[in-house]
Amino acid sequence: MRGGLKVLSGAQVVDILADFGFAVIGGTKHIKLRRYGPNGNETLVVPNHSPITKGTLRVIFSQASHYVPQAELHPHFYND
């Protein structure tokens, strides 16, 4: 069974996604990240909040899992 979501800030999520090859391409209140994958541009938007609400964090995890395998993302977003 999965543990609950971690409490993360926007900056922490940006750092996590950077580890998977995403780079900041702009934004202040909402940070836009992009990487170039085998199917073209892969873009994510992360609110620059501290902390990010649980619902928003779930959505970011879900969107990121379109580009990065959930098994690799899970330890960064969830407590076990």
Short names for language-model regions:
Residues 23-59:
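A short, structured beta-strand/loop element
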Residues 1-26:
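N-terminal first-folded block
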Residues 2-5, 14, 41, 54, ...:
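Generic N-terminal initiation segments characterized by hydrophobic and/or small/turn-forming residues
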Residues 51-80:
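C-terminal structural segments of small proteins and small subunits
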Residues 5-8, 17, 33, 44, ...:
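Generic detector of leucine side chains in alpha-helical contexts
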